[in-house]
Every structure is written in structure tokens, then in C-alpha cells.
Amino acid sequence: VSENESLARMGVASFLTKIDPTLEEINDIKTAVSEAVTNSIIHGYRDKKGIVEIKCHLRETIIEKEDEILHISLITIIVRDDGTGIDDIEKAMEPMYTSKPENDRAGMGFAFMQLFMDTVDVWSKPYIGTSVTMTKELKRIEKKGNNGCNNAD
């Protein structure tokens, strides 16, 4: 699990560098992706081999004002597997719920995804697979005449 999780985290961090996010923003998104990938491996494939697909999309909007430029980046990340699927998505998303209590799983994966991302949507069908779509909006303000950018709150 850890090698696949690390690869996913590095790939997503690499994707994010083009929009110059803060270290905290990168870590939040990497944590959410890590949880989604771990869920696919542990629960979707039940520790058997399988493919976990990660798609990253970026939509950028630039709004120019009198003395500043606002950069808005909407990041969408989709983590998909062809694993066993989830019978009850609502139950699976409850904090502390785990389908593998024997493995000392905390059942906090979806809770962490929801904490670190703006939206988390789950689609799943038993025996077909699961798709987790997460979004996060990042903003930064560039003062006109300033070569550097300042992140907005």
C-alpha cells in the first residue's frame, strides 16, 4: 500500500506545482488523495492486485482588478477503482466506520477527505467499482506591479 500511496501523493503534488500552492494546501490535497487510494487498495481490492486510476483536472480563472489580479484555481481529483464497490456509501462515509475492523483501521478515510477538500462525491456499485471525486478551490492575489504572488484567505 505505502509504495502506491507515495506514488499517488508525488504525482498529485507534481501536478499542483504549476499553480504555486502553499505547502499546507499541497499537504491537505495529498492527504485526501492518500486516503482515497488507500481505500481503493484495502477495501476495493481487498489487498489483491488491481488498478487505481487517478485523474487530475485544473480550471483556472483570472480576474483583473484595478490594483490586483485574483487567480482562482479549481482542482478536481478523481480516484477510481474496479474493485468490490461499496454497498452502503452513506454508512461507509460515517466517521469511525470500517469494513475491516480486524486490520485496526480507524474508519476516518472519508472524514479526512471531507476535512481537507471542499467537496467529496462518491459513486459506487457493488462488483463494479468506486469513484471518488474531490474538489478544492485555491485563491491567490497578485498585486499589480509586484512580481510575487500572495495567497488569499
Predicted regions: what is each one?
Residues 35, 39:
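Conserved polar catalytic motif of the HATPase_c/GHKL fold
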